[in-house]
Curated annotation (Swiss-Prot):
This is Choline transporter-like protein 1. Keywords: Antiport, Cell membrane, Glycoprotein, Lipoprotein, Membrane, Mitochondrion, Mitochondrion outer membrane, Myristate, Phosphoprotein, Transmembrane, Transmembrane helix, Transport. Residues 635-656 are annotated as: Disordered. Its main location: membrane. It comes from Rattus norvegicus. Glycans are attached at residues 134, 179. The keyword Ubl conjugation does not apply. The chain crosses the membrane at residues 30-50, 212-232, 238-258, 288-308, 315-335, 338-358, 380-400, 442-462, 537-557, 566-586. Pfam families: Choline_transpo. Choline transporter, acts as a choline/H+ antiporter. Also acts as a high-affinity ethanolamine/H+ antiporter, regulating the supply of extracellular ethanolamine (Etn) for the CDP-Etn pathway, redistribute intracellular Etn and balance the CDP-Cho and CDP-Etn arms of the Kennedy pathway. Involved in membrane synthesis and myelin production.
Length: 656
């Protein structure tokens, strides 16, 4: 592909970039490979459906291989198979709360029943009465309802008492317990570090009790993120100082409120509190102390960082001003995270559904207990691994399509001299160019990220499986490898994004674009450091502002429920969601800034302002980089390589 060809490198150094002029298809072999891979993903789904996995997944099946809600064929050498379950449409587990995490299944006999027990059944007499009234037998098919209380087999072939009240899961015809205590047992099996079962029960009940508040706070974080995007668009000059002041006030206010609540709850009388509420109060007090200490440490670190970067804050105003102009001309950029998230959700839903199909596909095999399991044998058993690789590659492909779309739109904006001549919808024009010319480049870039991500995930899995068993040296080596792969993945992701920008500008293949982008970034290393440090930090402050505001609102609202619920987990859920929402919105802004800078660097390298080679850039952006260079030089970090004076657009002087 020319990634390492010296001849290609020489040709690249002589080649002149012609933004938006020549357009051709790039990395076609990689597009064909990606299409073939997607066909393989479709084959896995089709194979699962064709072998009956879809019917077994949706309708469910009992422990003898009979699909509920239909007539079944007899399975060789398997008792109770081939039954007519036309009127038995629901799967009922005799012990639904008994979960086997290792084998990812419920360790219980499953039967097809006509109806789920809506009320708790405490005795076998209640089970018998339920069968006689509703015509739904909850014991094995070999036992008649009249024999439930008479036979000794009832303990093994009837449900575990008491039978919890259950309701059918929509679309999947499984009887699921409605009592959250059963789900608490599931979570207890997953969360092994919780030693006190009652703690987990209180945490889950806290989430269930505060679900309306959690939903409202999540919506608040979404609204705050959109408001921040509007502020960035219209008042970018004031935004930096507003963010700085608000983050200072927010971090101080949040830390102060946490310490105030801790002191208030610690001084509150406990003599009149009942034992159940006393335990909840102690949990809240401990959580408040941890939150307060963490917030204090975070605030101190944040202030130190802001103190070091105070001289560069003013420079960020110019950068945000130019990026704000992009959003004024390209307002649809704000909604790009929604389309990407929607595409990811659709793919993940398809992937999970196919994964569930794979869990019920294969040939019927009788296990040691005499029950039926479906297993895949031969080469087809490796479809799982293919499916997992598909999850990573296609997810990265969707994210890369977003990067290429944003890069194409911003490149169109930057290299259009008269902004009145911009396409009616630059975003759609960029999507059109992506589909027509550059899907192969996106496929190749996302595959490279996949190659790094898979080994890191394997090492993380090995590390988790060997936790507590390996020696200190092996543990250190594993963690070092994981960290190195993570750093490599981040570096490649940043280089990929700039490679997509280079492809959007000059329509070159991935290797050529990555090499050109890398050379330009190295030539402008000091400028990259200044822009990325200041710009990314201010966007990080925006994320902190949204999380602090949402968290502060959550503290005030959940504080009214501290007498009857533990709000540690609800607050964590809200803050995590707020950060994810803020990250999705502000990452687009960060992407625009990176694309603008690469366009600027290319502009200054290949144009000098003379007739026929006029600059494309905005004057504000050039002034920003010049001021950044001066600031770094005054700090003693400027170098001779960056000592040339940048000239404004009208001057006609060259600059690098």
């Amino acid at each position: 592909m020319g990634c390492c060809s010296s001849a290609s490198a020489a040709q690249s150094s002589k080649r002149e970039w012609k933004p938006l002029e020549d357009r051709s298809c790039t990395d076609i072999p990689w597009l064909l490979l990606f299409v073939l891979f997607c066909i393989g993903m479709g084959f896995i789904c089709g194979f699962s459906v064709a072998t009956g996995a879809a019917a077994r997944l949706v309708s469910g099946y009992d422990s003898y291989g009979n699909i509920c809600g239909q007539r079944n064929a007899k399975l060789e050498a398997i008792a109770n198979s081939g039954l007519d379950h036309t009127h038995r449409k629901y799967v009922f587990f005799l012990d639904p709360c008994n979960l086997d995490l290792i084998n990812r299944k419920i360790k219980s006999m499953a039967l097809c029943v006509a109806a789920c027990p809506r009320q708790e059944l405490k005795t076998l007499s209640d089970v018998q009465k339920f069968a006689e009234i509703n015509g739904s037998a909850l014991c094995s098919y070999n036992i008649k309802p009249s024999e439930y209380t008479l036979t000794a087999k009832s303990s093994a072939f009837c449900p575990k008492l008491p039978v919890p009240a259950s309701a059918p899961i929509p679309f999947f015809h499984r009887c699921a317990p409605v009592n959250i205590s059963c789900y608490a047992k599931f979570a207890e099996a997953l969360i092994t570090f919780v030693s006190d079962n009652s703690v987990l029960h209180r945490l889950i009940s806290g989430v269930m009790t505060s679900k309306e508040i959690i939903l409202g706070l999540c919506l608040l974080s979404l609204v705050l993120s959109m408001i921040l995007m509007v502020i960035i668009r219209y008042i970018s000059r004031v935004l930096v100082w507003i963010l700085t002041i608000l983050v200072i006030l927010g971090s101080l206010g949040g830390t102060g409120v946490l310490w105030w609540l801790y002191a208030k709850q610690r001084r509150s009388p406990k003599e009149t509190v009942i034992p159940e509420q006393l335990q909840i109060a102690e949990d809240n007090l401990r959580a408040l102390l941890i939150y307060a200490i963490s917030a204090t440490v975070f605030t101190v670190i944040l202030f130190l960082i802001m103190l070091v970067m105070r001289k560069r804050v003013a420079l960020t105003i110019a950068l945000f001003h130019v990026a704000g102009k992009v959003f004024i001309h390209l307002p649809l950029l704000v909604f790009q995270p929604f389309w990407t998230f929607f595409a990811l959700v659709l793919f993940w839903a398809y992937w999970i559904m196919t994964l569930l199909f794979l869990g019920t596909t294969g040939s019927a095999v009788q296990n040691e207990q005499g029950f039926v399991e479906y297993k895949i044998s031969g080469p087809l058993q490796y479809m799982w691994w293919y499916h997992v690789v598909g999850l990573i590659w296609i997810s990265e492909f969707i994210l890369a399509c977003q990067q290429m779309t944003v890069a194409g739109a911003v490149v169109t904006y930057y290299f259009t001299r008269d902004k009145r001549n911009l396409p009616f919808t630059p975003i759609l024009a960029s999507v059109n160019r992506l589909i027509r010319y550059h899907l192969g480049t996106v496929a190749k870039g996302s595959f490279i990220i996949t190659l790094v991500k898979i080994p890191r995930m394997i090492l993380m899995y090995i590390h988790s499986q060997l936790k507590g068993k390996e020696n200190a040296c092996a543990r250190c080596m594993l963690k070092s490898c994981i960290c190195c792969l993570w750093c490599l993945e981040k570096c490649l992701s940043y280089l990929n994004q700039n490679a997509y920008t280079a492809t959007a500008i000059n329509s070159t293949n991935f290797c050529t674009s990555a090499k050109d982008a890398f050379v330009i970034l190295v030539e402008n290393a000091l400028r990259v450091a200044a822009i990325n440090t200041v710009g990314d930090f201010m966007l990080f402050l925006g994320k902190v502002l949204i999380v602090c505001s949402t968290g502060l609102a959550g503290i005030m609202l959940l504080n009214y429920q501290q007498d009857y619920t533990v709000w540690v987990l609800p607050l964590i859920i809200v803050c995590l969601f707020a950060f994810l929402v803020a990250h999705c919105f502000l990452s687009i802004y960060e992407m625009v800034v990176d694309v603008l800078f690469l366009c600027f660097a290319i502009d200054t390298k290949y144009n000098d302002g003379s007739p026929g080679r006029e600059f494309y850039m905005d004057k504000v952006l050039m002034e920003f980089v010049e001021n950044s260079r001066k600031a770094m030089k005054e700090a003693g970090k400027g170098g001779a390589a960056d000592a040339r004076k940048l000239k404004p657009m009208a001057s006609g002087a060259s600059s690098a």
